[in-house]
């Protein structure tokens, strides 16, 4: 499927859905709309439902959503693909703080789930041996009090540590657990903004390797993430078509793939070059325009 739409302050300005069989090289159009040209082509949809869509369509509605409500199979398939996907926004500080203090659904009662989380955390922190969970109900507020169990050195007993006192990286991994588990189980797509925030580079690489390992990811789940960590710009981890850059100019962001990038000589980027080094040298664009930092304007020596 090839689906997309454009929106502006007046609503949907363009929308299209094209489809092709895996054995074919060309797409056929299912529908297309273009407000600027006053064009609406629904010829690829069932004829008996085209009139219903035409009458129900407004500037704020998507054909794919209307088609799904009308039980049109091809629209349902595309709509459900988006519905199964998960989005995590760690760039939103308030939302991120809420995620850091939340646990997977059913965590308090499900001992097996708690064990699964411990096993997940053991990939980078073997000191956490379990959890202690208490339900809190003061009448005004309901919630959970959670401690992590750490085995004492040279002892069979445990030290309890309030969950909120764990490192930010541990809290983020706990927040990610249910999202990772669900998309890997369903074979859907996980979108994560600022995946690298609060995570060690090697830990983040471990997450990428999990998606790249067919034994751990048999359902072909996908991970799409933003990051400022350049350590992963390497051919040993990612293909050129898996690396995308965003270049900001005049309030707009342009998105382009390393596979599409051409040098000044018009040549494609070779697979054997050092992606990270070339990126930091500015060869691929998408880097900030920096000048020397001066916090105080004129300093005590009279220089700016």
Segment roles from a protein language model:
Residues 1-137:
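Electropositive, glycine-dotted interaction segments
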Residues 152-283:
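Switch/communication elements of ASCE P-loop NTPase nucleotide-binding domains
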Residues 33-40, 277-287:
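Short, solvent-exposed cationic patches
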């Amino acid at each position: 499927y090839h689906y997309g739409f454009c929106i502006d302050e007046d609503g949907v300005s363009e929308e299209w859905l094209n489809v092709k069989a895996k054995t074919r090289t060309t797409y056929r159009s299912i529908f297309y709309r273009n407000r600027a040209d006053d064009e609406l082509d629904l010829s690829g949809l069932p004829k008996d439902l085209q009139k219903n869509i035409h009458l129900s369509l407004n500037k704020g509605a998507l054909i794919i959503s209307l088609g799904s409500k009308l039980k049109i199979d091809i629209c349902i398939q595309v709509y459900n693909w988006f519905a199964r996907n998960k989005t995590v926004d760690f760039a939103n500080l308030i939302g991120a703080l809420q995620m850091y203090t939340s646990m997977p659904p059913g965590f308090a009662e499900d001992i097996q789930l708690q064990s699964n989380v411990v096993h997940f955390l053991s990939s980078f922190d073997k000191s956490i041996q379990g959890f202690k969970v208490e339900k809190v109900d003061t009448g005004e507020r309901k919630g959970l009090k959670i401690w992590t169990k750490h085995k004492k050195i040279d002892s069979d007993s445990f030290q309890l540590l309030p969950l909120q006192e764990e490192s930010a990286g541990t809290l983020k991994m706990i927040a990610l657990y249910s999202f990772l588990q669900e998309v890997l189980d369903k074979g859907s797509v996980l979108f994560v903004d600022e995946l690298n925030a609060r995570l060690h580079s090697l830990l983040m690489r471990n997450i990428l390797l999990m998606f790249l390992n067919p034994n751990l990811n048999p359902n072909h789940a996908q991970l799409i993430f933003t990051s400022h960590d350049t350590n992963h710009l390497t051919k040993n981890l990612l293909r050129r078509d898996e690396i995308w850059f965003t270049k900001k100019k005049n309030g707009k962001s342009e998105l382009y793939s390393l596979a599409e990038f051409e040098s000044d000589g018009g040549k494609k980027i070779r697979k054997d070059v050092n992606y990270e080094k070339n990126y930091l040298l500015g060869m691929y664009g998408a880097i900030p325009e920096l000048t020397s930092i001066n916090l105080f304007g004129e300093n005590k020596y009279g220089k700016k």
